[in-house]
């Protein structure tokens, strides 16, 4: 609407910030925005997820996605040595949405990841991988042991491991340890993560 210079209707709006997901600005409000707003910052869903995780982990606050727009916008601005007020509003969020956002945030920060390795199909291999991961302080969340990846079952078994890490550096350390042990690890991309939008 600001670009067009008049109130315009979008064909669709797709965002997790549902409280501000409007296709058309208000007729009465729009002239005030034209006259008084200096700039508009566009925030994508992945930035809102990071802002949500920051608020939960660092401030122990739950703020709905639309209420986090101001926090996410701060990362686009030079706020050093300035007094800034970021208004946080709303707690309209159900537990399932909250859980999903936290999970996606952990994935974006490399705090949760899945790696696939091929193992010889013989006793002790799973224990060997588990011991290596424990040594690297990788916390196993989930294991998927697939013996049907190959026609020759004795040749290889696929093991998919979902792990908790401290961040990107730790994740890379775990992957390097698996590589060093001769496992040719492959990172598995999570389907449906917000970063794919």
Positions of PLM-derived features:
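A conserved regulatory-domain signal marking ACT and ACT-like small-molecule sensing domains
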Residues: 95-197
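Short low-complexity, flexible loop/linker segments enriched in glycine and/or proline
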Residues: 4, 57-58, 156-159
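Glycine-rich phosphate/pyrophosphate-binding loop at beta-loop-alpha junctions
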Residues: 1-35, 75-120, 130
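Active-site-adjacent helical/loop segments in soluble small-molecule enzymes
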Residues: 26-82
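A short, charged, Gly/Pro-tolerant segment at domain boundaries
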Residues: 68-69, 87-92, 193-196
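Glycine- and other small-residue-rich loops at beta-strand/loop junctions that grip anionic moieties
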Residues: 18, 22, 40-41, 60-63, ...
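Residues at the C-termini of beta-strands that transition into short coil/loop
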Residues: 44, 88, 189
């Amino acid at each position: 609407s600001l670009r067009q210079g008049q109130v315009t209707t979008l064909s669709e709006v797709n965002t997790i910030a549902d409280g501000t997901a409007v296709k058309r600005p208000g007729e009465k409000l729009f002239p005030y925005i034209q006259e008084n707003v200096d700039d508009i910052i566009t925030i994508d869903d992945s930035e809102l997820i990071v802002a949500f995780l920051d608020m939960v982990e660092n401030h122990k606050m739950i703020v709905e996605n639309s209420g986090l727009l101001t926090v996410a916008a701060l990362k686009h601005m030079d706020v050093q040595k300035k007094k800034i007020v970021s208004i946080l509003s709303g707690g309209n969020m159900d537990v399932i949405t909250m859980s999903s956002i936290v999970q996606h945030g952990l994935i974006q920060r490399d705090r949760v990841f899945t790696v696939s390795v091929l193992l010889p199909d013989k006793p002790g291999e799973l224990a060997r991988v588990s011991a290596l991961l424990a040594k690297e302080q990788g916390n196993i969340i989930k294991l998927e042991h697939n013996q049907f990846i190959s026609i020759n079952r004795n040749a290889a078994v696929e093991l998919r491991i979902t792990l908790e890490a401290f961040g990107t550096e730790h994740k890379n350390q775990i992957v390097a340890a698996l590589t060093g042990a001769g496992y040719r690890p492959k990172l598995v991309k999570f389907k449906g993560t917000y970063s794919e939008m």
